[in-house]
Every structure is written in C-alpha cells, then in structure tokens.
C-alpha cells in the first residue's frame, strides 16, 4: 500500500476543520494510525528539506500557538486557509493549551499536503524534556498512549531550526546565539537531534532580547542568554539582513518591536492560557518585503474578533516559565 493510500490527508484535514464554528474545546479524535502516519510522513519531508530554510515572500509568519486549536482556526480564517496563503510558523505548537493534538495534527497535515508552501520551525516546546512536563505528554497519554508521544518526539527531532525570507528576514523561535558567526553553522547541525542544554541550537530556541542588557546577559529562564539591541544591529549588518522575526514571549499586542524595529516578537495565541489579556498576531510579508500585522483579539472580548493594528504599545512582557521549573501547568 502506498503512503497516499495509508494516509487519507483530505479526510484527516476535513475532520479537523469540521469543528470550525463549534464551541471551542470540541475534540477531533483521529485514529492512532492516522496520527502515526502524519508524524512519519512529515518527518520524512522535514529531513528532505534544509535545516535552515530559504523561503520567498509573500508569506504569513505566525508565533506560538500552544495548543489553542480554535485560535489556530481563527488565524487561518483570517489569513486564508492553505494553500490560499503561504505560511511559516515559528514553533511552540504544543503544551499549555487544551488541544495540542488537534493543533499539531492539522499543522503536520498541511505540511504534507503543501510541502513547498507551508513551513514549520522548531520551538523550545518541540522537545521531549519540555513537553513531557508542560502538558503534551499528559494529553497524548490521556487520549491515546505514551508510544504515540514518542512518535511525535521523533518527528519534532527532525524539524528545521531557522528560516531566511528573501535573504533579508531571519526567523527562528527564540533568538540569537553568542556562538553564531556564520549561517553555515546552522546548516551543519545534524538531524534528527534533541535540543541540548546549551550551545547554538539551544540558544536559537531559547534566547530573548532585553532592552536593559548591553551585549549578552543571563536569562531568567535558567537557560540560554538575553541579548541587547547592539547585538541585533551587529548581526543584521554582518549578514546583510533587515529584520529578525522571532516568537517565544507573550507580548500584549501580539507583536512587539525591539532595537529600533530591527527585531519583532510575534505571539499568536490570544488570551494566552486564559491568564493573559493579550492579542495574537501574524505578520504578512508581501513581495516587496513590506511587513504588516494582522491581529487576533482575545475571542471572548471585543465584538470584532480581528483587527488591523499598526501602532506600538511596549507594554509589560511576561515570559514563559523557566525550563528548570518542574511544575506542570494544568
């Protein structure tokens, strides 16, 4: 039996999208074999494509989703369901939210169906030691079994780490690394791989910008570093880039600039965990590399679910809890 016979993608995507318009929280229970098939086939595609993706605009870039499946559906309603728009997601698909399984399954299904138009980077939560603690393991165990969680781990270990859009926009989940001198260093990272506790791969998934730091600083998460505006400016100049686009931190308006608009943080899970009153955002990059932001307001708030937003509100920036915090978030 061929892969396409084993994996009825259109049926899988159809069932995942059937709950659009239902009360948020309604589950979609794919079969275990279907999910295993999604993991195996997507892993094959990830490994066949570069670890440092070279992408072309136009595309839409999204930050953390964290199992907020109904908000992911709203993002697609707003931005256009694939293949209407090209997408790059910056990682953190699982953990914290209630529906990590639906979230990751839809994303993997779209990756398989549109491999040249739909791209997923690895976040720090696409790592067994993290999603063992923050919810994904428990969701897999409750709804399926631990073996399936291990199958997801195999797929996550093959995800690409960074992307460059039209040679000008550098994208990753976390941020820069003091070890990063050449893009070739990223290309040399061998997959499949776990996320180490330190070094280049760790930093790309874990580091954070900090306006109060000059150069490199300690990170409150207990892992990786923080970096200042000058680090950003030097990196962009050295590599002839215009912008760093990253995720990894809750920001009040769904997007937030840093270092004179040389770096932008995107966060795409509105009303994160039901605890923050943040908006979610995605960044549209057009053919001329002009960036605009589409905003998802917290669903239960304002009458308008969507809004175009161009102003800035620096706001406070709550950070996701540190890696070495052993408390799972229920």
Swiss-Prot record:
This is Serine/threonine-protein phosphatase PP1-alpha catalytic subunit. The active site is at residue 125. Mn(2+) 1 binds at residues 64, 66, 92. Phosphorylated. Dephosphorylated at Thr-320 in the presence of ionizing radiation. The keyword Transcription does not apply. Binds 2 manganese ions per subunit. The modification N6-acetyllysine is found at residue 305. PROSITE patterns: SER_THR_PHOSPHATASE. PP1 comprises a catalytic subunit, PPP1CA, PPP1CB or PPP1CC, which is folded into its native form by inhibitor 2 and glycogen synthetase kinase 3, and then complexed to one or several targeting or regulatory subunits. PPP1R12A, PPP1R12B and PPP1R12C mediate binding to myosin. PPP1R3A (in skeletal muscle), PPP1R3B (in liver), PPP1R3C, PPP1R3D and PPP1R3F (in brain) mediate binding to glycogen. Interacts with PPP1R15A and PPP1R15B; the interactions mediate binding to EIF2S1. Part of a complex containing PPP1R15B, PP1 and NCK1/2. Interacts with PPP1R9A, PPP1R9B and PPP1R7. Interacts with YLPM1. Protein phosphatase that associates with over 200 regulatory proteins to form highly specific holoenzymes which dephosphorylate hundreds of biological targets. Protein phosphatase 1 (PP1) is essential for cell division, transcription elongation, and participates in the regulation of glycogen metabolism, muscle contractility and protein synthesis. Involved in regulation of ionic conductances and long-term synaptic plasticity. May play an important role in dephosphorylating substrates such as the postsynaptic density-associated Ca(2+)/calmodulin dependent protein kinase II. One of its GO terms (molecular function) is phosphatase activity. Its EC number is 3.1.3.16. CDD domains: MPP_PP1_PPKL. One of its GO terms (biological process) is entrainment of circadian clock by photoperiod. It comes from Canis lupus familiaris (Dog). It comes from the Eukaryota. Pfam families: Metallophos, STPPase_N. The gene is PPP1CA. InterPro entries: Calcineurin-like_PHP_ApaH (IPR004843), Metallo-depent_PP-like (IPR029052), PP1_catalytic_subunit (IPR050341), Ser/Thr-sp_prot-phosphatase (IPR006186), STPPase_N (IPR031675). It is found in: Cytoplasm; Nucleus; Nucleus, Nucleoplasm; Nucleus, Nucleolus. It catalyses: O-phospho-L-seryl-[protein] + H2O = L-seryl-[protein] + phosphate; O-phospho-L-threonyl-[protein] + H2O = L-threonyl-[protein] + phosphate. Mn(2+) 2 binds at residues 64, 92, 124, 173, 248. Belongs to the PPP phosphatase family. PP-1 subfamily. One of its GO terms (cellular component) is nucleoplasm. The modification Phosphothreonine is found at residue 320.
